[in-house]
């Protein structure tokens, strides 16, 4: 993909997304605490793209136990080896246990992984690693990604795409921009169903895909936040574990 064409796509995508809003995919109800919650109807994605294959026995998965519930993601270590090594090492060390979600943008992302210093760390004495990108993985709704700083490097911060499905986040104008930028037809089709943020492709690392508990991610995404987009009431990561799918 030509860099100039990609840069033009990113700019246009950002302009398109400023006009996106919640719509017919949202249904209102009451949570156990009496607060209003929104159930998002997320359609099954029929696609040969890697992220939409149900995990097979032996696949590597991450289990996130949070105060809002449990969600699970299949990981792709061979597609982002440094990101996986760092994430798995931090999980083994218990780094994420007890941390809270530090940034929530409803209909966009839920983010965690910052330490007390607000910067995060790595298993390499805090030394960051470059973002790993591939045409095999994209920022569809439900993708598990590593945060990237202004220098294009990553540490412990991760986020899950909480974008709305279909044209609620991927408009026809954005589809046209993807086609102009040279996206594969299969990827465009998957974005049209799942929703997502293609303007983050080839800049941020995609490590995995949530396959169970997306309703929990959606609940986190609806938390009331302060002026810094931090949940007003802590949403805590009780534990993260890495295991094999059975």
Cite the ranges covered by each PLM segment.
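Cyclophilin-like peptidyl-prolyl cis-trans isomerases
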Residues: 2, 19-246
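Sec-dependent bacterial lipoprotein signal peptides
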Residues: 1-18
């Amino acid at each position: 993909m030509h860099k100039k064409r990609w840069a033009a796509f990113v700019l246009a995508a950002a302009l398109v997304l400023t006009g996106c809003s919640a719509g017919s995919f949202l249904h209102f109800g009451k949570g156990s605490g009496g607060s209003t919650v929104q159930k998002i109807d997320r359609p099954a994605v029929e696609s040969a793209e890697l992220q939409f294959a149900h995990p097979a026995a032996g696949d590597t998965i991450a289990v996130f136990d949070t105060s809002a519930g449990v969600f699970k993601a299949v990981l792709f270590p061979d597609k982002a080896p440094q990101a996986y090594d760092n994430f798995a090492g931090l999980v083994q060390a218990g780094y994420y246990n007890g941390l809270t979600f530090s940034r929530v943008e409803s209909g966009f992302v839920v983010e965690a992984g910052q330490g007390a210093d607000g910067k995060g760390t790595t298993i390499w004495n805090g030394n960051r690693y470059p973002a790993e990108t591939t045409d095999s993985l994209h920022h569809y709704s439900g993708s598990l990604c590593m945060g990237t700083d202004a220098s294009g490097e990553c540490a412990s911060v991760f986020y899950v795409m909480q974008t709305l499905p279909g044209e609620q986040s991927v408009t026809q104008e954005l589809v046209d921009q993807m086609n102009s930028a040279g996206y594969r037809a299969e990827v465009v089709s998957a974005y049209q169903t799942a929703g997502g943020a293609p303007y983050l492709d080839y800049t941020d690392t995609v490590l995995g895909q949530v396959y169970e508990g997306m309703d929990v991610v959606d609940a986190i995404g609806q938390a009331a936040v302060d002026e810094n987009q931090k949940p007003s009431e802590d949403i805590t990561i009780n534990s993260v574990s890495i295991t094999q799918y059975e």
